């Protein structure tokens, strides 16, 4: 039996706040996952899914049985109430509360595979695809420095399940992040629009990290100076720069090929 909730139920109020309030998310160490596919992936990745809410029109959805088999509490709410729970208006008929699963920055620094450092990225629509690319191209972790919340609902959607599997750590200072990595033998390569070597020319004789800056301003000078070297994704024609998600993904692919 799946319990039905009213719009004023405390569970509904909690989910609304988790969807919209970064401070509340971090105070509760929990976030929301939207859509049946992502909820199923969170369960498959053995994340701590605390509850799942669906609109009454989705009462017969296969996800209900999957959630019940996993021993997770499932609830139904009227469709109009469900529409007000999600972070955006969506046709995705499922919403889950999931516990935080932070990685440790020091643990990431000791891994052998490529790492990605996102320094003060502000757009979850860029950070999410980079988490996805990190998994796709064999990175062993993502280190997020300031900027967007790694548990922002838009980032989670844009990562398309990769944020459940890719270790993600946070640290406050980008220079400190680079020094943490270099002190453990990781060579750090700052992505810049011009003046760097192609990512295919990065030496593959040890662990590497790709350092990506925020969308309008790139990396601060102090971060660039702390890095081992600079890389630039070469372009032709009238294109003189790339979106950070595109440039980062291209560079990651090249670094993965070089380390293979």
Outline where the language-model segments fall.
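Short acidic-hydrophobic, aromatic-tinged amphipathic segments that line or gate anion-handling sites
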Residues: 3-7, 73-78, 167-176
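Boundary-proximal intrinsically disordered activation/regulatory segments immediately upstream
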Residues: 1-65, 147-149
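Short, aromatic/basic amphipathic alpha-helical patches
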Residues: 60-71, 222-223
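Structured adenosyl-cofactor binding patch, chiefly the S-adenosyl-L-methionine
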Residues: 96, 133-137, 147-150, 155-163, ...
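Glycine/small-residue-rich loop that forms an oxyanion/phosphate-binding "nest" at active or ligand-binding sites
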Residues: 67-97
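Active-site/ligand-binding-proximal alpha/beta "capping" segment
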Residues: 189-239
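RNA substrate-binding interface of SAM-dependent RNA methyltransferases
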Residues: 44, 101-103, 107-195
